[in-house]
Amino acid sequence: MDNPLNLIPAIPGEDWQAGKITAVLPRGLYRVRLDDGREVTTHRAGAVRLSHARLAPSTPVWVVLAVNDPARGRIVARRQ
């Protein structure tokens, strides 16, 4: 899904994936299970980091996967 919330300008080719946090890891990392079943390691980015949003297991989030490593990504927003 391409930038569903229009929070920040989408980078061409950037694909937002829906997922749910399954674990909070050390050093500000999170394990997220995407809706297609994949597990990725992510970190908070952008507005989520600046707002100090509390992210706990089972929180629904939007994730952008890294281009070079599809097993890593960044959390760009919380889902409603």
Predicted segments, located by residue:
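Conserved hydrophobic positions within beta-strands
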Residues: G19-I21, I75
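Short aromatic-glycine-enriched beta-strand elements
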Residues: P26-V32
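Short, conserved secondary-structure segments in the cores of folded domains
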Residues: K20, Y30, S51-H52
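OB-fold/S1-family single-stranded nucleic acid-binding modules
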Residues: V67-Q80
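Short boundary/loop segments of OB/S1/cold-shock single-stranded nucleic-acid-binding domains
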Residues: M1-Q17, R78
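Short nucleic-acid-contacting surface segments enriched for D/E, G, S/T with interspersed K/R
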Residues: V48-W62
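A short macromolecule-binding patch
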Residues: R38-G46
